[in-house]
Design a protein with these regions (language model features):
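Conserved class I S-adenosyl-L-methionine
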Residues: 1-48, 53, 57, 141-172
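Class I SAM-dependent methyltransferase SAM/SAH-binding core
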Residues: 53-98
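A short acidic, Gly/Pro-enriched loop at the edge of an enzyme's catalytic core
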Residues: 100-110
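Acceptor-substrate binding/catalytic loop of class I
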Residues: 119, 182-196
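A short glycine-rich, Lys/Arg-flanked "PGG" loop and its adjoining helix->strand segment in the class I
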Residues: 126-138
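C-terminal lobe and adjacent flexible extensions of AdoMet/dcAdoMet transferase-like proteins
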Residues: 205-264
Length: 264
């Protein structure tokens, strides 16, 4: 856990989601999908809020927002941003696996857009989903993001060829983990799922998936082109992407996937 906190200490998640079109696509797609459930007055809890790129937006939309973040430095940044924007957000430093400060059946929506990238044991993943089930009202919504292990293997081939070793790829494909000392710390503290595995996790914990989409589609593979779009071209590409991101054949190759599910 200390290594994970260190990974995100000093990380600028806001810039990551806005500095390039390829990352902006992730944010815009996620907000487009979540917007269907974020009417003013809705109670929304984000587990793994980082510096608040999403939680602050939810509050600006009129939602009653509770934000939980593991890394203390990120909590401080989010707190200051909320204060500067005069937004009322209930903010807690904590682990997505245990949020006792959030009341049972108190939330209309629970958003988990980062923790499942890093919960490396099956027990932890189930704990996080059980906490989501506990705090969400019956019939409420959970939104869960994950990183595809199949995409990560492709990223290694493209950017980190020194990791193309039998033992690295076998571990990644069989467990979703990367323990090789040559790997960047992000990968060593990560957990990378498969679309089927994440769906199973959600179903096992009392949710019914209603939508499963490829948040990035295949755009990461053509990042150089996407990042050099004009604003008009980006808008056109975004609209095309939003029409195709539910295509199941794109799920494994997309960097991020997103599942929307209802609490049974």
């Amino acid at each position: 856990m200390e290594e994970l906190i260190a990974q995100y200490t000093g990380a600028d998640e806001d810039s990551r989601l806005t500095r390039q079109y390829i990352a902006q696509l992730e944010y815009d797609t996620t907000m487009h999908v979540l917007g269907n459930y974020l009417q003013p007055g809705k109670r929304v809890c984000e587990l793994g809020a980082a510096t608040g790129r999403y939680s602050l937006k939810f509050a600006q939309m009129g939602c009653d927002v509770t934000a939980v973040e593991l890394a203390p430095e990120q909590v401080k940044i989010l707190s200051q941003k909320a204060k500067d924007a005069q937004l009322d957000i209930k903010l807690f430093q904590g682990n997505a696996c245990s949020v006792p400060f959030v009341a049972d059946s108190s939330q209309d929506v629970c958003v988990i857009l980062g923790p499942l990238y890093h919960l490396q044991t099956e027990e932890e993943r189930h704990q996080a989903m059980q906490e989501a089930k506990r705090i969400v009202k019956p019939g409420g919504i959970v939104a869960v993001a994950y990183i595809s292990r199949f995409f990560v293997a492709g990223m290694f081939a493209q950017k980190f060829p020194k990791l193309i070793k039998p033992e690295v790829l076998s571990e990644l494909l069989e467990t979703g983990l990367v323990s090789d000392s040559d790997a960047d710390s992000f990968f060593r503290v990560g957990y990378f799922s498969s679309p089927a595995e994440i769906e199973s996790l959600i179903i096992q914990n009392g949710f019914e998936p209603i939508r499963h989409l490829a948040t990035d589609g295949f755009s990461r593979y053509i990042a150089n082109g996407v990042n050099h779009f004009t604003p008009a071209q980006y808008d056109t590409w975004l609209q095309n992407h939003l029409q195709t991101c539910d295509e199941s054949s794109l799920l494994g190759s997309s960097n991020h996937g997103l599942i929307i599910a209802t609490r049974i």
